[in-house]
């Protein structure tokens, strides 16, 4: 099983903060990174902060698709369990989308990337302390960028 071999054998990255939510989010990002790597993706960066003056301006993960032609900005959302009353993408609200749009534009300009790019959301359902492997939903090409959007 990919999860047991990839996540449990390596020491998970922990943020400086001792908050439980930060640890859970970091664990979810570790799980998502292992999932993408096992699908043939290349992780370019994690917890990338392209906007120097805004500490909220963070991209959870930047990856290259298996064909290496597309840069994918990934937002990871970690939940203890699925909720029957909540939409899976409610965690990415208008304010978060605006921050992500600014962060992605900053990264694209900094790297001078003129190729294809998109925005994905990965949701991880599970607990760090649970013996059961987490469930993962990968939503590709979530509409974050306006149609035909270019910044140059």
Predicted features and spans:
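Interdomain/boundary linker segments immediately adjacent to catalytic/signaling cores
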Residues: 1-30, 34
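Non-catalytic C-terminal interaction segments of nucleic acid-processing enzymes
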Residues: 3-7, 122-152
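A short acidic/basic microdomain associated with nuclease active sites
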Residues: 34-54
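Conserved catalytic cores of phosphodiester-cleaving nucleases, focusing on short active-site segments
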Residues: 36, 59-83, 100
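A generic structural motif
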Residues: 49, 64-66, 124-127
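Short, solvent-exposed loop/turn segments that connect beta-strands within catalytic domains
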Residues: 54-55, 66-70, 128-134
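Catalytic cores of nucleic-acid endonucleases
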Residues: 78-129
């Amino acid at each position: 099983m990919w999860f047991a071999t990839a996540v449990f054998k390596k020491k998970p990255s922990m943020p400086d903060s001792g908050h439980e939510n930060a640890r859970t989010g970091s664990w979810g990002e570790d799980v998502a990174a292992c999932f993408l790597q096992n699908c043939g993706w290349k992780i370019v960066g994690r917890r990338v902060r392209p906007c120097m003056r805004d500490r909220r301006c963070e991209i959870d993960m930047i990856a290259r698709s298996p064909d290496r032609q597309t840069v994918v900005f990934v937002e990871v959302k970690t939940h203890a369990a699925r909720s029957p009353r909540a939409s899976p993408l409610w965690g990415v609200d208008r304010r978060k989308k605006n921050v992500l749009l600014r962060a992605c534009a900053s990264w694209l300009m900094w790297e001078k990337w003129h190729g294809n790019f998109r925005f994905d959301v990965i949701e991880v359902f599970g607990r760090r302390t649970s013996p059961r492997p987490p469930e993962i939903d990968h939503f590709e090409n979530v509409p974050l960028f306006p149609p035909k959007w270019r910044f140059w």
